[in-house]
Curated annotation (Swiss-Prot):
InterPro entries: Met_Sox_Rdtase_MsrB_dom, MsrB_Met_sulfoxide_reductase, Mss4-like_sf. GO terms for molecular function: actin binding; L-methionine-(R)-S-oxide reductase activity; peptide-methionine (R)-S-oxide reductase activity; zinc ion binding. Truncated MSRB1/SEPX1 proteins produced by failed UGA/Sec decoding are ubiquitinated by some Cul2-RING E3 ubiquitin-protein ligase complexes (containing either PRAME, PRAMF6, PRAMF9 or FEM1C as substrate-recognition component). Transmembrane segments: none annotated. This is Methionine-R-sulfoxide reductase B1. The gene is MSRB1. It catalyses: L-methionyl-[protein] + [thioredoxin]-disulfide + H2O = L-methionyl-(R)-S-oxide-[protein] + [thioredoxin]-dithiol; [thioredoxin]-disulfide + L-methionine + H2O = L-methionine (R)-S-oxide + [thioredoxin]-dithiol. It is found in: Cytoplasm; Nucleus; Cytoplasm, Cytoskeleton. It comes from Homo sapiens.
């Protein structure tokens, strides 16, 4: 079940190349392609962030199983974390808007794409 409006254009939903997904606004590293997996929702899904501070989380009103997530560096809105809804028991599912991400292919990482 999803809590976001879907407007289409989710270019990273079926994107599985090796690399890093960074914040579209500031370039901070958010998710590795290793944590991305196929899910039935229309948004890209990840099981974990790259760094403990990659995202900031706040409760979603009236939905104890969902947290709103934003970039841990600049505050750019990213989507949601759904607790215990990942591919394995106990894992989360990060449901992220493609428009909030930029993809950096493996081997093309720079200090700018890492948010430094």
């Amino acid at each position: 079940m999803s809590f976001c409006s879907f407007f289409g254009g989710e270019v990273f939903q079926n994107h599985f190349e090796p690399g890093v997904y960074v914040c579209a606004k500031c370039g901070y590293e958010l998710f590795s392609s290793r944590s991305k997996y196929a899910h039935s929702s229309p948004w890209p899904a990840f099981t974990e962030t790259i760094h403990a501070d990659s995202v900031a989380k706040r409760p979603e009103h009236n939905r104890s199983e969902a947290l709103k997530v934003s970039c841990g560096k600049c505050g750019n809105g990213l989507g949601h974390e759904f607790l215990n809804d990942g591919p394995k028991p106990g894992q989360s599912r990060f449901u992220i808007f493609s428009s909030s991400l930029k993809f950096v292919p493996k081997g093309k990482e720079t200090s700018a794409s890492q948010g430094h």
